[in-house]
Swiss-Prot record:
Cell location: Cytoplasm
A GO BP entry: chaperone-mediated protein folding
First-tier enzyme category under EC: isomerase
Entry similarity comment: Belongs to the FKBP-type PPIase family. Tig subfamily.
Domain notes: Consists of 3 domains; the N-terminus binds the ribosome, the middle domain has PPIase activity, while the C-terminus has intrinsic chaperone activity on its own.
Protein name: Trigger factor
Pfam families given in the database record: FKBP_C, Trigger_C, Trigger_N
Length: 427
């Protein structure tokens, strides 16, 4: 194989390589044997057409595209490796020569990984806005949240207050004409929940069961039903019931209802304190890691980040998100319908993050390379076993999904992140 690379501009160039006749000839034979099985040529049994007759009738060149499709991927990878390139996007392939009996010549326009000039990435000073200490208020807030989850709605005679639930019938109209979707019966509405359009719930506060209230509201300009957006509507609303939330007493019985593993309220508080401490410690570590990596990225200089890398990151992120939806049994089309979004919206969402994520990945990879990090066979095996446990898969399944090179890359990245984080100090 002959390989050459010519820089055209920063992070871009043309990789020219050949596919030799030593590779082409056996592949031609293989493709011919496959093609002739389906050929019906008068005078010859199906699948028994001699090669010279085929070449005369159809031309050897008719097989070239299939041969190229078979040989090109490996030839391209070998050329990239021989040229010592780190390619970061799909190449634009141009077959410049496919002469009979000659080596084939391919020119690939490639985008290469940009140069990263590292700044300081060890012993960094960082600031984080995350508290590690667990306060009594934190514990009480957690218990109060669970206590409210066990609350019951009890009918009250007094007028409705913010936080109460009302059971209502309502009929909506615009200029005296009812509209689709504007009617409901025995609907339970939490006052202050924001379930209905702004202003609706507020107008029911102070009213009691048995009353009928004319609720006057204006639909928001960006309301999803365009025929209603920005219009004033009247909802004739009848209140059937007013219910108040009644929370259980704060005692040992409540503690046991919340968590059957505890006997007393004091036990529950102690358990929550430990859980909150562990969660805060994890959040603190994540914050330090994020701040340290952000600082290392700020200290580095990336020479002309290729736009293709950002596109690749967006594409990867979108595919990962859609894949996660499908693994959860959620059809992507249904997700877009429910959320009122499109795949283009999803692309735009990830576009905003892609440049930052791409820069971060490049800097961490550069740190791993600068430090000479590698991964042993033992570390790779341990990583495979951990992934299998995390995703409830067989070890062999993980090995089939992820190549040794991918696993090695992930391990070296983890080492780089650990180095940046472990040497950082918090101001």
């Amino acid at each position: 194989m002959s390989v050459s690379f010519e820089n055209k501009e920063t992070n871009r160039g043309v990789l020219t390589f050949t596919i030799s006749q030593d590779q082409i000839k056996p592949e031609l034979d293989r493709v011919f044997k496959s093609v002739k099985k389906s050929l019906n040529v008068p005078g010859f049994r199906k699948g028994h057409l001699p090669r010279p007759i085929f070449d005369k009738k159809f031309g050897e060149e008719s097989l070239y595209q299939d041969v190229m499709n078979a040989l090109l991927p490996n030839a391209y990878e070998a050329a990239v490796k021989e040229a010592g390139l780190e390619v970061v996007a799909q190449p634009k392939i141009d077959v410049t020569s496919m002469e009979k009996g000659q080596d084939w010549v391919i020119a690939a326009e490639v985008v290469t990984k940009p140069e990263v000039k590292l700044g300081d990435y060890k012993n960094l000073e960082v600031s984080v806005d995350v508290e590690k200490e667990v306060t009594d208020a934190d514990v009480e807030e957690r218990i109060e949240r669970e206590r409210n989850n066990l609350a019951e709605l009890v009918i009250k005679e007094a007028a409705a207050e913010d936080g109460d639930t009302v059971v209502i019938d309502f009929v909506g109209s615009i200029d005296g004409v009812e509209f689709d979707g504007g009617k409901g019966e025995n609907f339970s509405l939490g006052l202050g929940s924001g379930q209905f359009i702004p202003g609706f719930e507020d107008q029911l506060v102070g009213h009691s069961a048995g009353e009928t209230v004319d609720v006057i509201v204006t639909f928001p300009e960006d309301y999803q039903a365009e025929d209603l957006a920005g219009k004033e509507a009247k909802f004739v609303t009848t209140i059937h019931e007013v219910k108040a939330k009644e929370v259980p007493a704060l005692d040992d019985e409540l503690a046991k209802d919340i968590d059957e593993e505890v006997e007393t309220l004091a036990d529950l508080k102690e358990k929550y304190r430990k859980e909150l401490a562990a969660a805060k410690e994890e959040a603190y570590k994540d914050a330090v890691e994020g701040a340290a990596i952000d600082t290392a990225v700020e200290n580095a200089e990336i020479v002309e980040l290729p736009e293709e890398m950002i596109h690749e990151e967006v594409h990867r992120s979108v595919n990962e998100f859609l894949g996660n939806l499908q693994r959860q049994g959620i059809n992507p089309d249904m997700y877009f319908q429910i959320t009122g979004t499109t795949q283009e919206d999803l692309h735009n969402q990830y576009q905003a993050e892609a440049e930052s994520r791409t820069k971060t990945n490049l800097v961490i990879e550069a740190v791993a390379k600068a430090e000479g990090f590698d991964a042993s066979e033992e570390e790779i095996q341990k990583e495979v076993e951990q992934l299998a446990a995390d995703y409830n898969m067989e070890v062999a399944q993980v090995q089939n999904l992820l190549s040794a090179d991918m696993l090695k890359h992930d391990i070296t990245i983890k080492k780089a992140v650990e180095l940046i984080t472990s040497t950082a100090t918090v101001k």
